[in-house]
Curated annotation (Swiss-Prot):
Molecular functions (GO terms): rRNA binding; structural constituent of ribosome
Keywords assigned by UniProt, alphabetized: Ribonucleoprotein, Ribosomal protein, RNA-binding, rRNA-binding
Name used for this protein in its record: Small ribosomal subunit protein uS13
HAMAP family from the UniProt entry: Ribosomal_uS13
Pfam families, per database record: Ribosomal_S13
Signal peptide limits: none
Subunit relationships: Part of the 30S ribosomal subunit. Forms a loose heterodimer with protein S19. Forms two bridges to the 50S subunit in the 70S ribosome.
Gene Ontology biological process terms, A to Z: translation
Disulfide bonds: none
Family: Belongs to the universal ribosomal protein uS13 family.
A cellular-component GO term for this protein: cytosol
The organism's place on the tree of life at top rank: Archaea
Gene3D superfamilies: 1.10.8.50, 30s ribosomal protein s13, domain 2
Length: 151
């Protein structure tokens, strides 16, 4: 084990503070846009032990992770693991993390609303978008109790 001085209680990766006591894949999964499967793939391709704690990562390893997430295809991440394939504007395969992901999703929803597609209309009305039933579930607002009638 490394000495106490080399352990960090909080590690900042891709703009997210991660507790140092988590294992690398589960710590990386706290970054918006990275799931556990992608984190395990990153560990395997970058040669980082997945059982290692995030707090024991060196600066070089953290930099490797950040560079890999900037261009995941370059290190061998398969295209199907990316979260934005065939981007609407550029046509490129991208993987977005953090604030970029939030911004692009919000922009996509606004575009759907603007072109008045079915999805956009559902978003605008605050209804379910993906074909779920709405008769009994997904009700919003205060619940009103049923009052018992007089006997």
């Amino acid at each position: 084990m490394l000495s106490e001085q080399q352990y960090r209680y909080i590690v900042r990766i891709l703009g997210t503070d991660i507790p140092g006591d988590l294992k690398v894949p589960y710590g990386l999964a706290l970054v918006k846009g990275i799931g556990v499967n992608l984190a395990y793939a990153l560990c395997r391709l970058l040669g980082i032990d997945p059982n290692k704690r995030i707090g024991f990562l060196t600066d070089a390893e953290i930099e490797k992770i950040e560079k890999a997430m900037a261009n995941p295809l370059a290190i061998g991440i398969p295209v199907w693991m990316l979260n934005r394939r065939k981007d609407y504007e550029t046509g490129k395969d991208l993987h977005l993390v953090g604030a970029d992901l939030i911004y692009y999703v919000k922009r996509d929803i606004e575009r759907e609303k603007r072109i008045r597609s079915w999805r956009g209309i559902r978003h605008a009305l605050g209804l379910k978008v993906r074909g779920q039933r709405t008769a009994t579930t997904g009700r919003i607002g205060m619940t009103i109790g049923v009052r018992k009638g007089k006997k």
